[in-house]
């Protein structure tokens, strides 16, 4: 199951006692962490007890201000699978308990080295001695050791399988894919970036899923740009 705007809308989002914007997505069936709308004010993301095994490389572009990420009891398996988190430059608190990756050799030192902004890992403060040991083992970002290069080369092969099986998917002959020109694609991306609400993003996503090009994105008036391909 992928994260959708509808799921975000239906989840708890509030200001916590620390005055931070918090989004609670615990106890869902999410397998891929990504597909967020632009959410610059989000500070805390709770994702415990999902099925997350993949983190999209573009995650930091959508939630650049994230400081706390709780991924307890998910399915992340390899150290390199966590690499997209290093682009969350404000991430200080990370929880990965009850993921297969925590059983990997060098797990804690790897996170400390690869995501240097993290100050608390699995509720334990990162110590200066740990940072020094991590640097000794893995080198620097520009000059990694052979061990670091080896770890970076091992990633999980991930597939997004719907939780309800094949019945959740429409038959192949019913799936519509919109043909977009480069200019139409850029306009749609701009419309999503400049959307003022989640409802507006939902509308754009729904129109695309239904095989329609949102108004304002078509090339020219009366253009037949909303042709659909079965």
Curated annotation (Swiss-Prot):
GO terms for biological process: mRNA splicing, via spliceosome. Residues 99-137 form the LRRCT domain. Transmembrane segments: none annotated. Keywords: Leucine-rich repeat, mRNA processing, mRNA splicing, Nucleus, Repeat, Spliceosome. Residues 213-223 have a biased composition (Gly residues). Associated with the spliceosome. PANTHER family: U2 SMALL NUCLEAR RIBONUCLEOPROTEIN A. This is U2 small nuclear ribonucleoprotein A'.
């Amino acid at each position: 199951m992928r994260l959708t705007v509808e799921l975000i809308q239906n989840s708890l989002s509030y200001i916590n006692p620390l005055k931070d914007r918090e989004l609670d997505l615990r106890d869902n069936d999410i397998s891929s962490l990504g597909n967020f709308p632009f959410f610059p004010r989000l500070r805390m993301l709770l994702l415990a007890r999902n099925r997350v095994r993949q983190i999209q490389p573009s995650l930091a572009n959508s939630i650049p201000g994230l400081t706390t990420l709780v991924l307890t009891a998910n399915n992340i398996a390899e150290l390199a699978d966590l690499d997209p988190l290093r682009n969350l430059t404000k991430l200080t608190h990370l929880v990965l308990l009850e993921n297969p990756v925590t059983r990997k050799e060098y797990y804690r030192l790897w996170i400390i080295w690869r995501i240097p902004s993290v100050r608390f890992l699995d509720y334990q403060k990162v110590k200066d001695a740990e940072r020094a040991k991590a640097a000794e083992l893995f080198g620097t970002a520009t000059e990694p050791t052979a061990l670091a290069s080896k770890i970076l080369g091992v990633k999980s092969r991930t597939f997004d399988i719907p939780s309800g099986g094949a019945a959740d998917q429409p038959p192949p002959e019913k799936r519509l894919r919109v043909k977009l020109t480069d200019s139409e694609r850029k306009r749609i991306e701009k419309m999503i970036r400049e959307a003022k609400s989640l409802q507006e993003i939902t509308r754009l996503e729904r129109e695309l899923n239904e095989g329609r090009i949102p108004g304002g994105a078509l090339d020219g008036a009366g253009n037949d740009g909303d042709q659909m391909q079965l």
